[in-house]
A protein has these predicted regions:
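N-terminal Rossmann NAD(P)H-binding glycine-rich loop of SDR-like oxidoreductase domains
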Residues: 34-55
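NAD(P)H-binding glycine-rich loop region in Rossmannoid oxidoreductase-like domains
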Residues: 67-68, 74-120, 128
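Conserved Rossmann-fold NAD(P)-dependent oxidoreductase catalytic core, especially the SDR/UDP-sugar
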Residues: 120-169
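Substrate-positioning beta->alpha
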Residues: 124, 175, 208, 225-245, ...
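Conserved beta-loop-beta element that borders a ligand/cofactor-binding pocket
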Residues: 141, 178-201
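Glycine-rich "substrate-gating" loop/helix at the edge of Rossmann-like oxidoreductase active sites
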Residues: 166-168, 196-205, 222-235
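A hydrophobic C-terminal alpha-helical subdomain
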Residues: 221-225, 231-236, 285-330
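Mid/C-terminal beta-alpha module of Rossmann-like enzyme folds, strongest
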Residues: 240-307, 329, 337-355
C-alpha cells in the first residue's frame, strides 16, 4: 500500500496571477513542497485543487490559459501537456502530481488531437515527474477503461478490448492508462483512479454528464435511451483522489463512483429536484444510432459539434455499472448519495446562466 504523505495546515487566500508565484497563508507552509494539479480549470481538477487548498496544501496549477481560471486560489504555471519544457518547469520542486487534465471530447474533427493530449501528454508529464524526483503521482483515468461484463458490475480487474472501445476518447484514455502503468512498473509511484460520472457544481464546460442536467433543464430531453451510469458527487471524487495519494498502491487502479442508475432514474431524480417532469418516452437504440450517425456525419462536413455524437450513442449501448468494493476497502472511500450533488448541479447551472 502507498505510504501517507505529509500535509500542510491553514488556508491559502491568494488568487491566480499570470505568472508563477509563491503562496501565502494563515498557516505555515514554509518548506512544504507544492502539489501540482493539471486540469484545474476543468470540473474535476477544480474540485481536486480546492480540496487540497482546504487542507492547507501548497497548490500549483498547470493551465494553458490563465484567463480561464475561476474561483480558485493558488499558484499558476502556464504550460501545455504537449510541451515537455513547460512541464519541466511545472513539476520543479513538487512532491506530488495529480494529473487530472484530459481532452474528453466525444467528437473531434481531428481525433489525433485527443491522442496527442491524452497519451503523449501523459507520457510527457510522467517523464518530467520522474526526472524531477516527484514522490507520488495520481493519474486520473476513466470508468471507460473498465470492462463491462455481461453479468454483474465491472471492477478494477474487468478487462477491455482496445479494438472494441467506442471512440477516440476512450481509446486514448486506455492507452494513457497503459503509459501510467508502464511508468509504475519502472519505479515511479503512480496510482490510477477511474472516476465514473462526477456531478455537482462548477461544471464549467459542462461535461457530458453535466450536459444531461443542462439539456433536461432546458427541455431538450423529451425522451431517453435505455442506458445507465454510475453517478458520484464530484466532491467525493476529489476526496477519492486524495485518498488514493495517501493510501493507494502504486500500479493499482481504483474506481471512484457511487450509485448505479439508469438514465430514466437519473431524469426522475432531476424532475423531483427541479420541479419538472420526467421524460416518458424511450428511444430504441437503432433510432438513436441513426440519429448519431446523421449528426456526426453533418459535423464531419461542417466542423460544427454534433448534437448527438455517434461515439456517445455507442457508449450508451452498455450500462456503465461498477463495483466500488476495492476503493472502499483499500482507500476508505465512502461516497455520499448523489441527490445532493444533483441539486447542487441544478442550482449552479441555473445561477450561472446555463439554462
Amino acid at each position: 500500500m502507498g505510504q501517507p504523505l505529509p500535509h500542510g495546515h491553514g488556508s491559502v487566500p491568494i488568487g491566480f496571477s499570470s505568472e508563477p508565484r509563491e503562496l501565502t497563508s494563515g498557516g505555515n507552509t514554509d518548506g512544504v513542497k507544492p502539489t501540482l494539479v493539471t486540469g484545474a480549470t476543468g470540473f474535476l481538477g477544480w474540485h481536486v485543487a480546492n480540496r487540497l487548498l482546504a487542507r492547507g496544501e501548497r497548490v500549483r496549477a498547470l493551465v494553458r490559459d490563465p484567463s480561464r481560471v475561476r474561483e480558485l486560489d493558488g499558484e499558476i504555471v502556464v504550460g501545455d501537456l504537449r510541451d515537455p519544457e513547460s512541464l519541466e518547469r511545472a513539476v520543479a520542486g513538487c512532491a506530488v502530481v495529480y494529473h487530472v487534465a484530459a481532452d474528453y471530447r466525444l467528437w473531434a474533427k481531428d481525433p489525433s488531437e485527443l491522442y496527442r493530449s491524452n497519451v503523449e501528454g501523459t507520457r510527457n508529464l510522467l517523464t518530467a515527474a520522474r526526472d524531477a524526483g516527484v514522490e507520488r503521482v495520481v493519474y486520473t483515468s476513466t470508468v471507460g477503461c473498465i470492462g463491462m461484463p455481461e453479468q454483474g458490475p465491472g471492477n478494477e480487474d474487468s478487462q477491455v478490448d482496445l479494438e472494441q472501445m467506442a471512440g477516440a476518447y476512450k481509446r486514448s484514455k486506455f492507452q494513457a492508462e497503459q503509459v501510467a502503468l508502464e511508468f509504475a512498473r519502472a519505479g515511479l509511484p503512480v496510482v490510477i483512479v477511474n472516476p465514473t460520472a462526477p456531478i455537482g457544481d462548477h461544471d464549467f464546460k459542462p461535461t457530458p454528464t453535466g450536459k444531461i442536467v443542462v439539456d433536461y433543464l432546458k427541455g431538450d430531453l423529451p425522451a431517453f435511451v435505455d442506458t445507465g451510469l454510475n453517478l458520484v458527487d464530484v466532491e467525493d471524487t476529489a476526496e477519492g483522489h486524495l485518498l488514493a495519494c495517501e493510501r493507494g498502491a502504486s500500479g493499482e487502479r481504483y474506481i471512484l463512483g457511487c450509485e448505479n442508475l439508469t438514465l430514466q432514474q437519473i431524469l426522475t431524480l432531476l424532475a423531483a429536484i427541479s420541479g419538472g417532469k420526467a421524460p416518458r418516452w424511450r428511444i430504441p437504440y437503432a433510432v438513436a444510432y441513426a440519429a448519431g450517425l446523421a449528426s456526426t456525419g453533418w459535423a464531419n462536413l461542417t466542423g460544427l459539434e454534433p448534437r448527438a455524437p455517434l461515439d456517445a450513442v455507442k457508449m450508451a449501448r452498455k450500462k456503465m455499472f461498477v463495483s466500488l468494493d476495492k476503493a472502499k476497502r483499500e482507500l476508505g472511500f465512502n461516497p455520499r448519495p448523489v441527490d445532493g450533488a444533483l441539486k447542487r448541479a441544478v442550482d449552479w447551472f441555473r445561477a450561472n446562466g446555463y439554462v
